[in-house]
């Protein structure tokens, strides 16, 4: 008979953080980065998260305005050139704020790879203040493995630390196979961005 293709759309538990838009103000400039994240997360019972961003004072008024908690934390962390990375392998909310400092216990050195450069992102970072970024730091490796790791994970590849930027999972001969895109830490920096909806709004 004819083969059938089943298409599924799935979300991990961090979707719970991306539903309700909220307004709130963090007024204490002495509040640390970690405390702010913890304040946002305190309503999500059972959540698990790790923060790999220096616990420095936020230094200014920080406003969440008509943003979900996920949107707000992503924007807030962009100030420190870092990102949120969700762990899709857990049933409850789990994420890492910033890249993991702990390498996974896998060896992918023998795997075939595809080497490439993301020139658009390279130029964008260079012209927006990250002029120390080199061409080699912008290199990307693409490897396929049956090991399961999450976005943001660190892997020692060919003797150097690399980080999983994205993954595509496919079924091959009944086995789950993942195609990983690896970047160096510098190539995964994000540029700060702002909530345009705040412009012109009176904050009481």
Please state what every model-predicted region is:
Residues 1-204:
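Amphipathic alpha-helical and helix-coil boundary elements used as assembly
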